[in-house]
UniProtKB/Swiss-Prot annotation:
Gene Ontology terms, MF aspect: coenzyme-B sulfoethylthiotransferase activity
Family that this chain belongs to: Belongs to the methyl-coenzyme M reductase gamma subunit family.
EC number(s) on file: 2.8.4.1
Name of the protein in its database record: Methyl-coenzyme M reductase I subunit gamma
Assembly description: MCR is a hexamer of two alpha, two beta, and two gamma chains, forming a dimer of heterotrimers.
Catalytic activity from the UniProt record: coenzyme B + methyl-coenzyme M = methane + coenzyme M-coenzyme B heterodisulfide
Main location: cytoplasm
């Protein structure tokens, strides 16, 4: 019988949102359409229209030894062309952001190939071939309900702010002030790229989502939202893992695991 992945335990809306993020068969709601060139500007690795820099010749031009694994795995387009590795990094506010670091790590690994990612307390980096990363960033990481202009920041450096209070417009604090709230349009504008270099012209990433919408799609348990302690199934799994790691790792005897 084929294995059907469960993705994540829990019976609450938060648990279901996490499962939806991780499940490659679930198509997240598209909320905006940021032009490709604007995504390139925010990432800051190349100029719009500039050729991709390469680190090796196209694979079809390379004289490589036989490798069964390489024959089995279809390379990404960026790998085929020899494009270099680049990154994009996001900071997620604790105030009902749609995504958060561990959710991002699990989602990236379930949905995408050829990625490397690193989890920190308030930010998550993803690295892959540059051309593939640009497409992934636009089509999933920014255009969909995985992103909110106010509660998620694209920050390659000086990422602090995820746990700080929001400003009067609901924007997460950013020490480099990469984005501003346009009171005329109600949209968020990026005036700097992800590492804080000023842009020639602002990039419009759309209108912040209403608080009700954020609470509906967030993957964060909060006492003023959906408390984690309300999800009995999740608590059972977390306690089991904690007990197995603590007691099993320290003294891996049969009676420890019988009590799990």
């Amino acid at each position: 019988m084929a294995y059907k992945p469960q993705f994540y335990p829990g019976q609450t809306k938060i648990a279901q949102n996490r499962r939806d993020h991780m499940n490659p068969d679930v198509q997240l709601e598209k909320l905006r359409d940021i032009p490709d060139d604007d995504v390139v500007k925010i990432m800051g690795h190349r100029q719009p229209g500039e050729d991709y820099k390469t680190v090796h010749p196209p694979l079809e031009e390379m004289d490589l030894p036989e490798d069964y694994v390489r024959d089995l795995v279809e390379p990404l387009n960026g790998a085929k062309e020899g494009h270099r590795i680049r990154y994009i990094q996001f900071t997620d506010s604790m105030y009902f952001a749609p995504a958060q670091p561990y959710d991002r790590a699990r989602t990236y690994m379930w949905r995408f190939r050829g990625v490397d990612t690193g989890t920190l307390s308030g930010r998550q980096v993803i690295e892959m071939r540059e051309s593939d990363l640009e497409a992934l960033s636009k089509n999933f990481l920014i255009d969909t309900a995985f992103f909110d202009p106010a509660r998620i920041g694209i920050r390659g450096a000086t990422v602090h702010g995820h746990s700080l209070r929001l400003d009067e417009n609901g924007l997460m604090f950013d020490a480099l002030q990469r984005y501003v709230y346009d009171e005329k349009t109600g949209h968020v504008l990026y005036v700097k790229d992800q590492v804080g270099r000023p842009l020639d012209e602002p990039v419009d990433v759309g209108e912040p989502l209403p608080e009700e919408k954020l609470k509906e799609i967030t993957t964060i348990y909060r006492i003023d939202g959906v408390p984690m302690r309300e999800d009995e199934e999740l608590l059972t799994v977390v306690k089991r893992i904690h007990r197995a790691r603590t007691l099993g790792g320290f003294l891996p005897v049969e009676d420890v695991f019988e009590k799990l």
